[in-house]
């Protein structure tokens, strides 16, 4: 391989966090129409998606809640539906619905679209400039219908941008430093815990840039509880298989899985999101460049 080609190949491996098109490609990536699309078709298709999702995000966030509404819905301790701080009354139905709504939107389409739009903008720039090819930009997120367990939420639906480096570091610590037997339950669950611990530190650093430091940030609480949910889930699934065997999952079993997944996330996700609503500048919760507000003001002046 010529020196220039080898250098570009090495550079690509260093910059493709998901290992796209390499032997290290992370699992569960769905390759869609971009695999066979021409550059022009890919750019047009991606630009349409960016525009549509950007406008929806702008519409959902251009009118932030007032300080009074923020305190009423996301006030100190409101993120806890269980084990509430002393002085807070038991959660009401409105609290439960707020937690569920924030989770379904923030960890469903709205949260994923915020990340996806940036990813697609980068793909347009890279493919448009000839730096990469369309097939190197598969969808960042999977289908939300895959998330009928916590494992599948993180492995099949949510983005895998940092899975490769995080798993590499956790595997090194478990196998080479701690020398845990492989396979074993200790190695399996410590690896998962370390991955979420690294993720929590990354989110804590992001919060810090927004001025939300410990103990205000809920990153550690939210992400370090994910392995607990996965362990409980694995135990329940093992018991189910022992009782029912390896029969294919029925639609009712999947329905129970969806309820479990989103119920658990509704208990822990607000631990991360509510402090952002409380302490972060509301302008940071919207799109980088608002479109709807200036348009409405323009037509209001014209009217």
Curated annotation (Swiss-Prot):
Keyword flag rRNA-binding: no
Pfam families: MBOAT_2
Name the UniProt record assigns to this protein: Acetyltransferase ataH
Protein topology in the membrane: Multi-pass membrane protein
Subcellular location: Membrane
Pathway membership, UniProt: Mycotoxin biosynthesis
Record-annotated membrane-spanning stretches: 42-62, 194-214, 257-277
Phenotype of the disrupted gene, per the record: Impairs the production of acetylaranotin and accumulates chemically stable intermediates or shunt products such as bisdethiobis(methylthio)-deacetylapoaranotin and bisdethiobis(methylthio)-deactylaranotin. Also leads to the accumulation of deacetylhaematocin and demethyl-deacetylhaematocin when ataS and ataY are also deleted.
Keywords: Acyltransferase, Membrane, Signal, Transferase, Transmembrane, Transmembrane helix
An MF annotation (GO) of this entry: O-acyltransferase activity
InterPro entries per record: Wax_synthase, Wax_synthase_dom
Annotated EC: 2.3.1.-
Family in the record: Belongs to the wax synthase family.
Entry function: Acetyltransferase; part of the gene cluster that mediates the biosynthesis of acetylaranotin, a member of the epipolythiodioxopiperazine (ETP) class of toxins characterized by a disulfide-bridged cyclic dipeptide. The first step of acetylaranotin biosynthesis is performed by the NRPS ataP which produces diketopiperazine cyclo-L-Phe-L-Phe via the condensation of 2 phenylalanines (L-Phe). The ataC domain of ataTC then catalyzes the formation of bishydroxylation of cyclo-L-Phe-L-Phe.
Example GO BP: lipid metabolic process
Signal peptide start and end residues: 1-23
Example of a GO cellular component annotation carried by this entry: membrane
Enzyme class: transferase
